[in-house]
């Protein structure tokens, strides 16, 4: 059985995501795969490439042939050079980590803002008004 390492397309129109899979060479592009060994997301900047190096080395060792796009990915990650015994390429560009927002606890959490309410509740206002009216009516009657 001829085995190929190829890309399986996922995602929406104009938003492709690929899985790097090992499949029989006669199966269709998005058909049944023997094993999934990586990811490739070309739309992200820089492109996201994750490859399970151990599984790639195994499949290349037993004779699986990578397609041209997969071969380019393997060369960028250095797995192809490792398999061939050549020097490794320059390291890949890694995305800068996003700035994290300060956590709720770091800003003081619930404890910082606790105190008495600035505005009074409506029920309390009505009770105060009713008490004031009843006391004023008692003082006028007496």
Swiss-Prot record:
InterPro entries: Ribosomal_bS16, Ribosomal_bS16_CS, Ribosomal_bS16_dom_sf. Keywords: Ribonucleoprotein, Ribosomal protein. GO terms for biological process: translation. It holds the Pfam family Ribosomal_S16. It comes from the Bacteria. Residues 132-142 have a biased composition (Low complexity). Residues 101-142 are annotated as: Disordered. One of its GO terms (molecular function) is structural constituent of ribosome. One of its GO terms (cellular component) is small ribosomal subunit. The keyword Ribonucleoprotein applies. Belongs to the bacterial ribosomal protein bS16 family. PANTHER family: 30S RIBOSOMAL PROTEIN S16, SMALL RIBOSOMAL SUBUNIT PROTEIN BS16M. This is Small ribosomal subunit protein bS16. The gene is rpsP.
